[in-house]
Amino acid sequence: MKNLFLIFFFLVFSKAVFALEDVVMKGEAFDKNNKLVYIETHQFKRLISGEITEIKTEYHNAFGKLIAEVSSDFSKDPFIPDTVFVDYRFKEKQELTYDKDSRVISLKFTDMKSGKIKTNEFKRTGNMVSGQGFHNYILKNFDEKKSDIKFIVLPKLDYYSFYFEQETPKAEGERRFVLKISNWVLRAIVKEIAVDYRIKDHSLLSFEGLTNIDSDTHDSQILKIKMSYPGVDNDKKSL
């Protein structure tokens, strides 16, 4: 009887832990003049822990036109998802593929207008993070004060050393995390990325810094993105 109870408990517990929830998150990106630049809509699956297992994001400009989209699959690694990013304005595709057996990360940039392709690959090392895997990394290290990470910058086909730390939050009940490049020379030209989370449910509230979406003139842009969760009450757990 005891063994049957243990088996039943294990099955129920496992089902609860690995149950997936479908969530939609909307982000509105504003420039320094508080002008809406684009809207991002994230549709993702997550575990009860909040960890994302797969996500698809669409980006529409302020007039509602689809300008880019990205899909991420976390089945091989929670911090380094297989990723495909397409920018329809510039006809460009960026891809990341992770071979779990060889621990090799392959990056690919394709100019779909000319057909030109650039690639790079390297071995996965500890504390390596890519793209939308940053959220999972934050959840895993929510109580850490500071740590060093290697952040993969897909458009550059390379990774850079950053440090990740908590800073004074903007409001009570929130926690702020910042990502700063370690090289002090580059730090003068690369602005930090800051994200705000609600402590009680670990929900993402806002993002500030360099975004993965360039301006219409193909320049980098620093924006503030405000998050909301259509159809989800504020009291319920969000991303």
For each feature predicted by the language model, list its residue ranges.
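Sec-dependent N-terminal signal peptides
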Residues: 4-13
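Sec/Tat signal peptide C-region and signal peptidase I cleavage site
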Residues: 13-19
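Acidic, serine/threonine-rich low-complexity disordered tracts
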Residues: 20-24, 29-79, 85-87, 93-100, ...
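Contiguous hydrophobic, core-forming segments of folded domains
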Residues: 65-138
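Solvent-exposed helix/loop surface patches that form functional interfaces
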Residues: 106-178
